[in-house]
Every structure is written in structure tokens, then in C-alpha cells.
Amino acid sequence: MRKPINLLREFSVPLIAGVITALAWANLDPRGYDALIHQPSFGGVSLHFLVNELFMVLFFGIAAAEITQSCLPGGDLNPPRKAVNPLLATLGGVIGPVLVYLSLNAVIGDPTLTKGWGIPTATDIALAWLVARLVFGAGHPAVSFLLLLAVADDAIGLAIIAVFYPDPVHPTEPMWLFLTVAGIVAAYILRGARAKSYWPYVLVGGGLSWTGLFKAHLHPALALVFIIPFLPHPPRESAHLFEENPRDTSPLARFEHDWKIVVDFGLFLFGLANAGVRFSSVGTATWLVLTALLVGKTAGILTMGSLGKALGFPLPDRVGFKELALTGLVAGMGLTVALFVAGVAFVDPDIEGAAKMGALLSGGVLPVAVALGRILKVRRIP
């Protein structure tokens, strides 16, 4: 029997609880919610800052660790040929939503919404994994396919945040990025010195990287993305995504093991700090984001996955047209990264709230995907 604490993490209960709490609080007591989240009540900084610029360092650090492990020999994205179809599907899952978002906005003709194109590009790994297990069963190859797609999707999402979404209020000061480069150099030196703990990498390399990004008015939450790949790891990866190898005691594996539970439960605070939008916030940006997530993701993944198969890069066993289409629909669940991008894409709080509502409404994929799975008679594999 699985422990209750593992069940809570597996079913994303902390994140969902944070989102529900934020929605209820922001609509019942908006002043009280705003005072807690946005007022500088914690040593001169707000809870929103502590969550989005400090806690999210760990979230993106864990994502970087999973991507690094997947790219190692024996990992799920290595050798490259094995990953071609999921990577093509990932590309479709990014390009599709962008094209849908920008095309619809061109028809609407609202240039103030253009910057939101990056919001629907990322997939919420944890929630998509949960829904995929309900639709396909835990043992279905479509679940592993979706996980590979979601991890690669997150890698592209990190790049989009770093390149296309600088601080909307303060101009970028590139000179400070030398500190980030210094952090990378420090991590490289530590690796050469065979430092056996991840702490020097995180504190020295990560600290320099965070300070450089913060001073440059970029997103310090990405600080560890540049450091984690330097953590020592075994020459081959023997576990699949989200699996732990108890024999792997490398700094990379220990970092993920030690901080994954902190991140999983800390996502309650992320949901609380970022999902507090009023129901009256629904607007044009809501429908742009929601349509781009559901239609763009599904069409993009279905198109590029089918193209990969036609080019000789096969889909996994038991993944045909209907399974691929359902995978695309499930990948349209954008929450964590989508909320983060919405918060940095728009300065206007009304537009930001409307865009966040679109990301939140994508959670409605769950009952739709389960129902379609039964209608299409998708065979579940426990």
C-alpha cells in the first residue's frame, strides 16, 4: 500500500489545494488576499516574491535535473533516434499553441495581448501525468510518451521564459550576467574538483547565478537551470522519468531526491500566490489561452507525431491515431509554468488575471479526456 504522503504528491493535491484556496480567498476577500500575497510583510519582501523568485528556483532546478538525467546514455531521451518522435511531438505542442494564439489574436486585433503567446506553450507535467494514468492506465506506453514530451516541453518553456520574457517593468542590465557566468564557471570548477555534495554547486554556483539574473532584471527563478547540468552523475542513467535508483548516490540524484518532496508540497504556496484571480477576470485573454492550449496542443502534437511516424520514426506500441490525439489533449493542461509566464507577460493586472483564468480552465481537460477515452474505447493497461 502506498503511503498517504506519496498519494498526496502523486495526485498533485498540494498544488490543487493551493489553487482552490487562492480562487476562494481572492473572490471572497480580495483585500485580505492581496495584503497577504503582495504586501512586503516578510522582511521587506512579499510572499509573491518569496514564492516566484526563490521557491521556484527549486522547481525549475528539479525540472533541470529530470531533463539532464533523461539526456544521459540510457535515459529516456538518449540515444537521439529513440526520442525523435516525442521531440517532434513536443515541437508541434509548442508551435501549435503559438500559431493558434497569434492567429486568433490577429483576427481580434488586440496588440496588447500579443505578449501572451508563450503562456500556452508548456505542459503541467504532474497534472498531465495524473490525467494520462486515468485515461490510459499506468502501464500504457502513451503515459511514458507523454512524460517524455512534457519534460522536453518544459525545457523549451524554460528557454522561452529566459529569452522572451525579461522584467516587464525594469530594463535588462546585461552586465550583471557576468555573475551568472561566474556561477557556471564555479560549477564547472567544482565538478573538476569532484565535489561530492550538491551544496557547493547550489550555494556558490546557484547563488552567483541568482544574483546575476536578479540584478540583470531577468528571472532569478531560472538560476539553477544553468548549474544543475554540472552536478556529477553516473555515466549511464538506469531509471526512467520520476523513478529513483536507490544505488545512485551521485550529487545529481541526491539533489532531486532531497528537494522533490519540498517542491511537491511547496506547490501549495505557488498555487496560493499565483492563482488568486477573480471570476470576473474572464476576458479575451482567457479564451485565447484556453483555445491555444486545447486546440493548439492537440493539433500540433497529432500533426508532428504523425509526421514523425511517416518519416520512419515510429510511435510507441499501442499508440495509434486516437491515443496520440488524446495525448495531445491531455498535454493541453497548462498550470504551473503557464501561470508563471502569465505573471511575467503582462503588466496590466486585469489582462494577467484573464490569462491566468485561461490556464486554470484548462484543468477541465480531465473529465473530457476520461470521457473521450471511453467513447473511443481506448484500452487501458493497469
Swiss-Prot record:
It is a multi-pass membrane protein. It catalyses: Na(+)(in) + 2 H(+)(out) = Na(+)(out) + 2 H(+)(in). Pfam families: Na_H_antiport_1 (PF06965). Keywords: Antiport, Cell inner membrane, Cell membrane, Ion transport, Membrane, Sodium, Sodium transport, Transmembrane, Transmembrane helix, Transport. Its main location: membrane. InterPro entries: Na/H_antiporter_dom_sf, NhaA. PANTHER family: NA(+)_H(+) ANTIPORTER NHAA (PTHR30341:SF0), SODIUM ION/PROTON ANTIPORTER NHAA-RELATED (PTHR30341). This is Na(+)/H(+) antiporter NhaA. It comes from Geobacter metallireducens (strain ATCC 53774 / DSM 7210 / GS-15). The lineage of its organism: Bacteria, Pseudomonadati, Thermodesulfobacteriota, Desulfuromonadia, Geobacterales.
